[in-house]
Amino acid sequence: MALKKASLACAVCGSRNYSIKISGNPKPTRLEVNKFCKHCGKYTTHRETR
């Protein structure tokens, strides 16, 4: 199956700072990663958005 684009949005401010490619298969949970948010100026949880 083809890869799909998804964004990682900051859980605090909601800005979409990162884009990733994921497999097209639906998953029950969304990806959560700790990454640096340039708008908040600190490391926060980023969640997958579609």
From Swiss-Prot:
The organism sits in which domain of life?
A: Bacteria
Please list the GO biological process terms of this entry: translation
Task: Show the GO MF annotations.
Answer: structural constituent of ribosome
Q: Could you state one GO cellular component term attached to this entry?
A: cytoplasm
Listed InterPro entries: Ribosomal_bL33, Ribosomal_bL33_sf, Ribosomal_zn-bd
Q: In the UniProt record, does the keyword Ribosomal protein occur? A: yes
Alphabetic keyword roster: Ribonucleoprotein, Ribosomal protein
Q: Name one Pfam family in it.
A: Ribosomal_L33
Show the HAMAP family listed in the entry.
Ribosomal_bL33 (MF_00294)
Q: Which family does it belong to?
A: Belongs to the bacterial ribosomal protein bL33 family.
- What name appears for this protein in its UniProt entry? Large ribosomal subunit protein bL33B
Q: Which organism is it from?
A: Streptococcus pneumoniae (strain ATCC BAA-255 / R6)
